[in-house]
C-alpha cells in the first residue's frame, strides 16, 4: 500500500481491520469467487474476504493497482520487497503472514538435463531464494 493511503486511514493492526479499508481483490481464472486472504499467527490460522473497488486477475495487476494507490494488495513478499525497500509501498500485517516454504519443482532425475533447463533452474533458485520466509 502506498504511504498516502495511511495519511487518511489508520494502518491495519490486525486482519479484521482490513474490513475498514479499500482492498484490491483477486479472482483467478480457475475459480469464480474472490480469493480470501490467508493469515497465520502463532497457532491461529484463518481466511478473510475483504471488500474493494478493484478486482485483479494476477499478482502483477494487484501490484500495479497498489502502486497506483487503489487499495491494499495481498501479494507475495518477494514481489513487493523491492518496492517496500524503495519506499513506494508499505508492508502491513507482516506478523500475520503465513509461512511460505518455497516452490517445489519435480522432474525426472534419470535423464540428461539440458543446459537450458539447468539455467532455468538456476534462475529460479537465484530469484526465489532471496526474501521468501
State what each model feature region is:
Residues 16, 63-64, 118:
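Alpha-helical segments flanking ligand/cofactor-binding loops in enzyme cores
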Residues 77-86, 96-133:
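C-terminal effector-binding regulatory domain of bacterial HTH transcription factors
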Residues 24-43:
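Secondary-structure junction motif
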Residues 46-91, 98, 113:
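Hydrophobic hinge/microswitch elements
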Residues 3-5, 29, 42-44, 109-111, ...:
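Short loop segments at secondary-structure junctions
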Residues 8-9, 26, 83, 92:
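Residues that scaffold the ATP/ADP-binding catalytic core of kinase and kinase-like folds
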Amino acid at each position: 500500500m502506498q504511504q498516502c493511503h495511511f495519511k487518511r486511514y489508520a494502518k491495519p493492526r490486525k486482519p479484521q481491520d482490513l474490513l475498514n479499508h479499500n482492498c484490491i481483490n483477486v479472482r483467478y481464472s480457475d475459480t469464480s469467487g474472490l480469493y480470501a486472504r490467508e493469515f497465520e499467527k502463532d497457532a491461529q490460522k484463518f481466511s478473510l474476504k475483504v471488500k474493494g473497488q478493484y478486482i485483479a486477475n494476477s499478482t502483477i495487476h494487484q501490484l500495479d493497482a497498489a502502486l497506483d494507490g487503489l487499495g491494499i494488495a495481498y501479494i507475495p513478499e518477494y514481489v513487493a520487497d523491492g518496492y517496500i525497500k524503495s519506499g513506494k509501498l508499505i508492508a502491513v500485517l507482516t506478523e500475520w503472514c503465513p509461512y511460505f516454504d518455497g516452490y517445489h519443482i519435480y522432474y525426472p532425475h534419470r535423464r540428461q538435463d539440458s543446459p537450458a533447463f539447468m539455467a532455468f533452474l538456476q534462475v529460479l533458485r537465484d530469484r526465489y531464494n532471496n526474501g521468501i520466509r
